Each structure stands twice: as structure tokens, then as C-alpha cells.
Swiss-Prot record:
Disulfide bonds: none annotated. It catalyses: Na(+)(in) + 2 H(+)(out) = Na(+)(out) + 2 H(+)(in). The keyword Cell membrane applies. The chain crosses the membrane at residues 13-33, 58-78, 93-113, 120-140, 153-173, 176-196, 216-236, 256-276, 279-299, 326-346, 363-383. This is Na(+)/H(+) antiporter NhaA. The lineage of its organism: Bacteria, Pseudomonadati, Campylobacterota, Epsilonproteobacteria, Campylobacterales. GO terms for cellular component: plasma membrane. Na(+)/H(+) antiporter that extrudes sodium in exchange for external protons. One of its GO terms (molecular function) is sodium:proton antiporter activity. InterPro entries: Na/H_antiporter_dom_sf, NhaA. It comes from Campylobacter concisus (strain 13826). It is a multi-pass membrane protein. Its main location: membrane.
Length: 409
């Protein structure tokens, strides 16, 4: 439970920093700083190794490089949770997994209904299916102990399943032309990671070097480079036979949490959330992509997560999180519509970082996420007050009964 509390603490604090980074990006893009901001994002950085080198603008180093670190952390969390955490027990994963399925299907259907006549726009169908765990937990942190820990764990587990679905979606639907040569290099790296794991190698540097080479190979192969982070994480040992109490996976996960929560995600938000509001009019806001995205996040997510979860509980496939009620569960479902960084990331893959929709697509992500966050916060705060009032009323009734019994005696 200590690991879960630490995770929640990091993600919640990081969520607040994400909000600050988002506001900063919006201010930069919509003030006299806009030219400087855009030139800064286009600044090229080159890393060379002899005759080999990589030269990319800052925004791509962030989206392909830093986000690979984020997905590496997601991979570590997935492995740990499956082997000894919340995902180990089928009964514990049932409700979040079913809720995540609803949160994937319904938003995608809503987006499809709005964009089915435009094949290019339809490519962004996965944009409203994502949940930003850092932002969502950041909002939850504002409510403090009024939200049961069981609900926070439910949201965290649902978001992890959500991230797993995002990984599969990126691999299947957002991969460009493939390079057989680079895929072969990546395969050799995979074999090397497997060998390091089986031989019980304890050097983090060895895994880092092989992982870095694999990242470059995957980047050059046509498969999105972030997937290298996930795959590499699966080969990090969770324990060693001769030192069962030592875990390389947990050690790396612990070291990375702070860097990702307070560095990677805020930087990603700052370079991707710079939405220009100058060219966005009513026509753009009411365009199929914008409506499909905003309604997919705000309506689709809450309807999908709550309806699937509600049916799972009613048909006894899963149980309501301990100490919670259906209003609180609905509040969490609404909060799942905070797609923000993950939605922006999928948006950049779907539309190749173009401004084809005059920033209306990104603005829709921002609006859908903000409205979902605000509505979820209000619902959870309201349900917490009601629950406190009911508990107080029950205490008064119990005290009254006890007093009557004492008088009779």
C-alpha cells in the first residue's frame, strides 16, 4: 500500500504542475511571446556518435524521446502490477478493466459518428479514448481524504489499463512504413535484453545502453519510438534469485517517478498545449473533429466507464470499491474524461503534428478535459458532503438510541 500512496502523491502533485505548464503554453502562444515560442519548438538539436547522428526539432525530441521515458515507466508499472500488484488478482482488475473497455468503446463510437465522412479526420478516432492519470489524480488531490483510497486505486488501475490499450492502439494504427533493417536491429536488442534478464545481470547501465540502441532502431524503423520504452520495461528484472529482497524494477520505478511527474509530462504539456486561439472561430469549434473530440471526452468517457462499471456490478462480475457509492463512482467516470496529455500525444500521431484543423482539435481536447475535470470535481465534492451528512445523521440516531436504552435501565 505504501507504493500506491507514493504513486498517488507523485501523480497528484505532478498534475498541478501540468496545469501550470498548460497555462504557460497558452499564454506564450497567444501573446507577444508567440514567435519566440514557436521558434523555440522548431530549434534543432543534434546528437552524434561518430558518423551516426540524430537531428530533430525540440518538439520531436520531447514527443519521441521524453515520452519514451514516460512509456518506459508505464511498462514498469504494468509489469509490477501484473506480477504482484492490483492487476495480479482477477477480481481486483475486473471493475477497472470493464470500465476501461467502456471508456474506450463509447468515445471512439461518438468520434466515428461525427467524422465518418472524412477519412483523414477519422484517423483521430483514438484521441478521446485516453485518460491523463496525472491530471485526474491532481484534481482528486484537491479533495483530500474526502475521496476513499479505494476509488483512487480504481482510477489508477483503470488508467493503467487505459495506457495499455493506448500502447496497443499506437502499435496497430499509428505506425508508418516499416524498415526491415531497423526492425532487425531492434530484434537483436530485444534478444540482448532477454539474455540480460535470464542471466540475472544487475547492471542498470547494461539495460540502459541496450535500451537506448533499441530506441534509435525503433525510431528509424517506422514504429513509434515510445513503444521501445514499453518493451524494454518488460525485461527489467523485478527480483534476483540470489537477492530476493532486491528489485531493480522497483528501484528504477522509484527513481523515475519524480522525473516523469515533475519533468517529462510538464515539458510535454508545455510544448504541445500551445494552442493559438486567434484562428479559432465558431465554425472550427463546431467542426466534426472538434465536436467528436470534446463530446467523446466529456460525454463518451463518463457514459462508457460508468455504464460498463454499473452493469458489471449489477451482474456481479465485479464489486463496488470499498467505502464508496455509485455517485462517487460516477464522479470518477466523469473525471476519466480528462484526456489532456495522452489525447494530445495521440492527436500528434493521428494528424502528424499538422495544423489541418486550425488548432480546433487541440482546443477541443483542452475544453473536453477541463469540463470533465471541473464536473468530476464538483460531483465528488457534492457526494462527499452528502456522505458526511449521512454519517453524522446515523451517529446522532445511534446516540439517541443509546441514551433511550440508558434511561430505561
Amino acid at each position: 500500500m505504501g507504493g500506491i500512496k507514493e504513486f498517488l502523491k507523485h501523480e497528484a502533485s505532478g498534475g498541478i504542475l501540468l496545469m501550470i505548464a498548460t497555462v504557460a503554453a497558452l499564454l506564450c502562444q497567444n501573446t507577444f511571446l508567440s514567435d519566440f515560442y514557436n521558434e523555440f519548438l522548431k530549434t534543432k538539436f543534434t546528437v552524434s556518435f561518430g558518423e551516426y547522428g540524430l537531428s530533430k526539432p525540440l518538439i520531436l525530441w520531447v514527443n519521441d524521446g521524453l515520452m519514451a521515458v514516460f512509456f518506459f515507466l508505464i511498462g514498469l508499472e504494468l509489469k509490477r502490477e501484473v506480477l504482484e500488484g492490483e492487476l495480479k488478482n482477477p477480481s481486483q482488475i475486473a471493475l477497472p478493466a470493464i470500465g476501461a473497455a467502456g471508456g474506450l468503446i463509447v468515445p471512439a463510437v461518438i468520434f466515428y459518428l461525427f467524422t465518418k465522412h472524412d477519412s483523414f479526420a477519422l484517423g483521430g478516432w483514438a484521441i478521446p479514448t485516453a485518460t491523463d492519470i496525472a491530471f485526474a489524480l491532481g484534481i482528486l488531490s484537491l479533495l483530500g481524504p474526502r475521496v476513499p483510497t479505494s476509488l483512487k486505486i480504481f482510477l489508477m488501475t483503470l488508467a493503467i489499463v487505459d495506457d495499455l490499450c493506448a500502447i496497443v492502439i499506437i502499435a496497430l494504427f499509428y505506425t508508418s512504413e516499416l524498415s526491415a533493417q531497423m526492425l532487425a536491429v531492434a530484434s537483436v536488442c530485444l534478444a540482448a535484453l532477454f539474455a540480460l534478464n535470464r542471466l540475472g545481470v544487475k547492471s542498470k547501465a547494461a539495460y540502459l545502453i541496450v535500451g537506448a540502441v533499441m530506441w534509435v532502431a525503433v525510431l528509424k524503423s517506422g514504429v513509434h519510438a515510445t513503444l521501445a520504452g514499453v518493451v524494454a520495461a518488460f525485461f527489467i528484472p523485478i527480483s534476483f534469485k540470489d537477492e530476493p529482497g532486491k528489485s531493480m524494477l522497483k528501484s528504477i520505478e522509484h527513481d523515475l517517478h519524480g522525473w516523469v511527474a515533475f519533468g517529462v509530462l510538464p515539458i510535454f504539456a508545455f510544448v504541445n498545449a500551445g494552442i493559438s486561439l486567434r484562428g479559432v472561430g465558431l465554425d472550427e469549434i463546431l467542426s466534426p473533429v472538434a465536436l467528436g473530440t470534446a463530446l467523446g471526452l466529456f460525454v463518451g468517457k463518463q457514459v462508457g466507464v460508468f455504464s460498463f462499471s454499473f452493469l458489471a456490478i449489477k451482474f456481479k462480475l465485479a464489486k463496488l470499491p470499498e467505502g464508496s457509492n455509485f455517485i462517487q463512482l460516477y464522479g470518477i467516470a466523469v473525471l476519466c474524461g480528462v484526456g489532456f496529455t495522452m489525447s494530445l500525444f495521440i492527436n500528434s500521431l493521428a494528424y502528424n503534428d499538422t495544423d489541418a484543423f486550425a488548432y480546433a482539435d487541440k482546443l477541443a481536447i483542452l475544453l473536453g478535459s477541463v469540463v470533465s475535470g471541473a464536473a468530476g470535481f464538483i460531483l465528488l465534492k457534492f457526494s462527499a458532503k452528502n456522505q458526511s451528512a449521512r454519517i453524522k445523521e446515523c451517529k446522532i440516531q445511534i446516540e439517541t438510541i443509546v441514551e433511550k436504552c440508558e434511561i430505561k435501565e
